């Protein structure tokens, strides 16, 4: 099974994106987040798809069910490969998101995979309990959210690799787990708290990893990509 290594294009604009992509092998699986999408709009997705890349559009929708359904119907027309929502929006919202994707997917294309964000990798247990008022440990909160996502018909969830084993225990091994917060051992942790190396994510069973600064901020992005790819593929 090919498990994706997804590069986070966390850049300000299309020019910065093109400069980064010039340094990397092609085609890639890339993540377009809020900053780049809000700066450049759907045209940047069209360009990436025309160049042969797979795209994870990371907008983390979280609104009332009808609004999310209508938004997902529009996002499906872009031909992206993965989109996401916040699981905290609830089962009805997540189910509506899937309905919107199915309605908007062009005939002959596969529906984008729909995954749910459980807890951000910048969240620690103190924040979970004191700020979000979730009186559970991280494993309990994430596994509960994963079960809700599966109930709503999602394809998988976003979580730290540390929670992947318990997600698979509750939702089965075929339930997709996409893991951000990936760092090489020598890298700065930045604003992430629940981080792992590519090798650790592979061992814990992540389906895909999302890597940003360890590649994009490296002196030699292509060399960093190759190191991470080898660790991930084993």
Swiss-Prot record:
Catalytic residues of the enzyme: 60
Keyword Lyase: yes
GO CC, one annotated term: cytosol
Pathway involvement of the protein, from the record: Pyrimidine metabolism; UMP biosynthesis via de novo pathway; UMP from orotate: step 2/2
Top EC group: lyase
Reactions that this protein is recorded to catalyse: orotidine 5'-phosphate + H(+) = UMP + CO2
EC code(s) of this entry: 4.1.1.23
Transmembrane regions listed in the UniProt entry: none
Coiled coil (residue ranges): none
Keywords annotated in UniProt: Decarboxylase, Lyase, Pyrimidine biosynthesis
NCBIfam families (UniProt xref): PRK00230.1, pyrF
Job of this protein: Catalyzes the decarboxylation of orotidine 5'-monophosphate (OMP) to uridine 5'-monophosphate (UMP).
Subunit structure: Homodimer.
Family: Belongs to the OMP decarboxylase family. Type 1 subfamily.
Protein name as it appears in the record: Orotidine 5'-phosphate decarboxylase
Organism expressing this protein natively: Halalkalibacterium halodurans (strain ATCC BAA-125 / DSM 18197 / FERM 7344 / JCM 9153 / C-125) (Bacillus halodurans)
Phylogenetic lineage: Bacteria, Bacillati, Bacillota, Bacilli, Bacillales
Encoding gene (name): pyrF
């Amino acid at each position: 099974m090919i498990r994706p290594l997804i590069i986070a294009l966390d850049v300000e604009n299309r020019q910065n994106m093109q400069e980064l992509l010039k340094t990397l092998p092609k085609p890639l699986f890339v993540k377009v987040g809020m900053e780049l999408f809000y700066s450049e709009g759907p045209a940047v997705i069209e360009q990436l798809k025309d160049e042969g890349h797979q795209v994870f559009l990371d907008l983390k929708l979280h609104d009332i069910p009808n609004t999310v359904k209508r938004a997902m119907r529009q996002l499906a027309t872009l031909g992206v490969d993965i989109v996401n929502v916040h699981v905290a929006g609830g089962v009805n919202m997540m189910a509506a998101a899937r309905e919107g994707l199915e309605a908007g997917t062009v005939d002959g294309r596969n529906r984008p995979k729909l995954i749910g964000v459980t807890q951000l990798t910048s969240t620690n247990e103190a924040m979970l309990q004191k700020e979000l008022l979730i009186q559970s440990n991280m494993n309990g909160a994430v596994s509960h959210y994963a079960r809700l996502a599966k109930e709503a018909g999602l394809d998988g969830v976003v979580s730290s690799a540390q929670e992947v084993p318990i997600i698979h225990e509750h939702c089965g091994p075929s339930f997709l787990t996409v893991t951000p917060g990936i760092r090489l051992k020598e890298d700065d942790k930045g604003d992430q708290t629940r981080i792992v190396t590519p090798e650790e994510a592979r061992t814990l069973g992540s389906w895909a990893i999302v890597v940003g600064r360890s590649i994009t901020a490296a002196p030699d992005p292509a060399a960093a990509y190759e190191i991470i790819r080898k660790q991930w593929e084993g």
